[in-house]
Amino acid sequence: MNLIRRVSAIYKEQELPEYRGNPLIEALPEALTEDEVLLEMSYFPEIDEKIRWTAPANVREQYVERIKKFRCPQTNLIQAYKMILRALRESYAARNPLKSGTIQYLHYYGNERPDIEPESGYFKSQAETITIVGMSGSGKTTMIEQVMDHFPQIIEHSSYKGVFPGFSKQIVWVKINCPYNSSVRDLCEEILQKLDDAIGIERTTPEIRNGALARQIAQRIKSSFLG
């Protein structure tokens, strides 16, 4: 989870009309069937019979450690995959970078909007939130990491249908850990740092005042098309 996976955009025609013509959605991996989810996100370490029966005890002891990498997805992983995929697509559906409403949304600070309504209408967020609750150690983080690893973290765009789409990098996701001291300020600075690292730019100097820092982060999230 520490390495940032970057890919070049490969656009795929979408079946749903609300997703068509949107480079942010067309560049995402194709939706998997339930069987494909289970197959891709499972891992069963191969058993070497020679090591199992004839290797020295110390080697067999190390070999058993491979069981820690064993992954046998359950049905809740399928549901998590569907929820995350839907959240990504719905969020991007409202932010088609080729529409005038999105261009207005990107260029105005915070929730400001022009007096004249864009041709495609004012921007309306369709962002979703997902809550996963479970006992400590039940595998929530591992499950989410498995699902997120299916998606590239950065998609680089250069040409969409023969023209420059107006942006070059799309941050699909970032993982933020809550600070140990529960500081809102530290959390905000961590978000800003993660976005800088994902884009590949020098660390941005955080604003001193919390309100200004929040607006700084919001603007960075906008411009990077965070999923």
For the regions a language model picked out, list residue spans one by one.
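A short, basic N-terminal segment
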Residues: 1-125
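Mid-core helix/loop region of P-loop NTP-binding domains shared across ATPases and GTPases
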Residues: 81, 93-115, 121-125, 166-170, ...
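Hydrophobic anchor at the beta1->P-loop junction of P-loop NTPases
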Residues: 132
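The conserved Walker
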Residues: 136
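Conserved lysine of the Walker
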Residues: 140
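Hydrophobic positions on the alpha1 helix immediately C-terminal to the Walker A/P-loop
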Residues: 143, 147, 187
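Post-Walker A helix-loop "phosphate-sensing" segment adjacent to the P-loop in P-loop NTPases
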Residues: 150-162, 197-200
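Conserved catalytic segments around the Walker B and adjacent sensor/switch elements
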Residues: 155-179
